């Protein structure tokens, strides 16, 4: 974890501190040890090779969530801005039953996507009694704009993230352009949860048998409009 200190130009004093983490790789070999480290042993991530029916038929079930790593977060923001503006104009409010937090930690979107997925399936799986469970219980009592700070100040979870980030096969880029979001089944509804967005977005019905297929259909617009094929997806499924 790194703190970037920014000076106040007028007084020459420290005005703010920004928390920066190492970026996670979209790789089960990084994500699964992270879950074990934070006390979650009931689920694991597996690669989603393709969204075609043949590839999906080999995925374990039930499928609880999907983590999607997108290229070029700036273009993603441009694509999503009018969608959220329309939802706001329609007075759509964040669903009370969906756990969500605003991301204030740079490069931490992989862990935010994972934590959003885990937090919203606690009624379906055993999340254990480790550091994630303890953090989640505390985070539930805070506002969505306070939960990121709670995570940033949790030395155990920060260390677990850092260890997982260093497991990746790729070198850390100078500027991280990829961005993780998650799709999760909450009470039979598929939600898209993006820690850079203002609130979770309901997409329609889903189930443990069809979640990855449904999520694949939902994210198709990204794949069609981004001039980049560097996508990666992982499904969250029962641990073998």
Where are these regions (language model features)?
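Cysteine-dependent deubiquitinase/ubiquitin-like isopeptidase catalytic cores across multiple families
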Residues: 2-240
């Amino acid at each position: 974890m790194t703190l970037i200190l920014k000076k106040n130009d007028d007084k020459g004093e420290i005005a703010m501190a920004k928390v920066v983490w190492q970026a996670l790789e979209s790789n089960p070999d990084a994500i699964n040890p992270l879950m074990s480290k934070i006390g979650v042993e009931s689920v694991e991530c597996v690669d989603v090779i393709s969204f075609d029916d043949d590839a999906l038929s080999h995925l374990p079930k039930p499928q609880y969530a999907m983590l999607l790593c997108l290229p070029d977060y700036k273009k993603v923001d441009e694509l999503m801005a009018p969608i959220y503006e329309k939802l706001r104009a329609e007075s759509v409010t964040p669903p009370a039953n969906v756990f969500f937090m605003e991301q204030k930690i740079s490069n931490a979107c992989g862990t935010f996507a994972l934590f959003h997925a885990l937090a919203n399936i606690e009624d379906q799986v055993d999340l254990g009694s480790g550091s994630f469970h303890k953090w989640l219980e505390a985070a539930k009592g805070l506002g969505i704009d306070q939960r990121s700070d709670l995570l940033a100040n949790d030395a155990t979870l920060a260390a677990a993230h850092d260890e997982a980030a260093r497991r990746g096969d790729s070198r850390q880029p100078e500027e991280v352009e990829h961005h993780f979001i998650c799709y999760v089944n909450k009470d039979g509804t598929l939600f898209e949860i993006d820690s850079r967005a203002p609130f979770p977005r309901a997409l329609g019905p889903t189930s443990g048998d069809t979640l990855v297929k449904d999520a694949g259909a939902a994210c198709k617009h990204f794949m069609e409009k981004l001039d980049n094929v560097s996508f990666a997806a992982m499904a969250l499924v029962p641990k073998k």
